[in-house]
């Protein structure tokens, strides 16, 4: 198949590999993006590509946590331009939708759009969205949301980075969540959320890593090691060390703490548990990167002018 310049550029941005290497990788893998990333990693030409590097859209990620810290919502709403994303009307719309989800607990996005809007039950959320699009003058999409509810002992906290470019919501479980310890635990939860915004974990523990994800990594490490000519028994030992490093990269409970690199997240939790007088554990988290997985339509102004003038 013919490989386009756009495909090569996308792969280059995601992996940092050279243009010619990206072109060859795409040609070898029939244009498949993920397989091309694996090919480059096998050849030692790229690190693991983060999907966030492919993000390209405008809007805002926002978080909403109930006063009792028992419920939380992480929300992404997209706009066409950064100008509108900074508009007070758009920000108010994001806040209203977040508060609606927090108060009504819809099952999913479609159910939420069909609900009576909590700010004006005479209209649905979809109607409110349509009205807001007309007023703001730009297409707006309520893309996704995640809602956490604490059933037992525990609380929820969140962190929003760079004015809504990255958002993280964290839930911890602990019998030590009391009014006396609330400041200690809420500070911890926010710090863990801030860490997660920077470190980009994908799972809490290594046990949560899907088998197919783990096998894919092993295959890449194995293929790369075989190119060195090492015997299989040595290769398998090398893979064990590389997989442990992989866990340290993607599992929150195995990461080095970004605010103090002399500590790990488990050590931070242990210290906070001692201060609060009860064990604190991270049960789950959600991390949204604005526009993650979406592609922004890019225009070539020179080409548009040439086309308008009837030039090739």
UniProtKB/Swiss-Prot annotation:
The stretch of residues making up the signal peptide is none
Q: Is this entry keyworded Protein biosynthesis?
A: yes
InterPro entries per the record?
A: EF-Ts_dimer_sf, Transl_elong_EFTs/EF1B, Transl_elong_EFTs/EF1B_dimer, Transl_elong_Ts_CS, UBA-like_sf
**Any single GO CC term annotated in Swiss-Prot or TrEMBL for this entry:** cytoplasm
Renumbered residue ranges of the record's region Involved in Mg(2+) ion dislocation from EF-Tu: 81-84
Q: Which UniProt keywords apply?
A: Cytoplasm, Elongation factor, Protein biosynthesis
Keyword Cytoplasm on this protein?
A: yes
Its chief place of residence is cytoplasm
What's a Gene Ontology MF term here?
translation elongation factor activity
**Similarity comment: family membership:** Belongs to the EF-Ts family.
Under which name does UniProt file this protein? Elongation factor Ts
What organism is listed for this UniProt entry? Pelobacter propionicus (strain DSM 2379 / NBRC 103807 / OttBd1)
């Amino acid at each position: 198949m013919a490989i386009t310049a756009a495909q090569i550029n996308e792969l280059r941005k995601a992996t940092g590999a050279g243009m010619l290497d990206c072109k060859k990788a795409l040609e070898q893998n029939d244009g498949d993006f993920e397989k091309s990333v694996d090919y480059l990693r096998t050849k030692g030409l790229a690190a693991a590509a983060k999907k966030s590097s492919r993000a390209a859209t405008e809007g805002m990620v926002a978080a909403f946590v109930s006063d009792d810290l028992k419920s939380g919502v992480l929300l992404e709403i997209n706009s066409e331009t950064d100008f509108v994303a900074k508009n007070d009307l758009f920000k108010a719309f994001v806040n209203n939708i977040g508060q609606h989800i927090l108060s009504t607990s819809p099952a999913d996005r479609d159910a939420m759009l069909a609900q009576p809007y909590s700010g004006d039950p005479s209209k649905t959320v979809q109607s409110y969205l349509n009205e807001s699009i007309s007023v703001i003058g730009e297409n707006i999409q309520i893309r996704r949301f995640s809602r956490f509810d604490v059933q037992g002992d525990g609380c929820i906290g969140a962190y929003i980075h760079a004015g809504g470019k990255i958002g993280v919501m964290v839930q911890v479980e602990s019998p030590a969540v009391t009014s006396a310890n609330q400041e200690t635990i809420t500070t911890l939860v926010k710090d863990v959320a801030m860490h997660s915004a920077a470190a980009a974990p994908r799972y809490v523990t290594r046990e949560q890593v899907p088998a197919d994800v783990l096998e894919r990594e092993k295959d890449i490490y194995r293929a790369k090691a075989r190119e060195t000519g090492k015997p299989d028994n040595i290769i398998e030992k090398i893979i064990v060390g590389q997989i442990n490093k992989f866990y340290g990269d993607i599992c929150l409970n195995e990461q080095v703490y970004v605010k103090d690199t002399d500590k790990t997240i488990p050590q931070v939790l242990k210290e906070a548990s001692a201060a609060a007088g009860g064990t604190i554990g991270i049960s789950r988290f959600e991390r949204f990167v604005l526009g993650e997985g979406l592609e922004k339509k890019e225009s070539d102004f020179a080409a548009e002018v040439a086309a308008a003038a009837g030039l090739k």
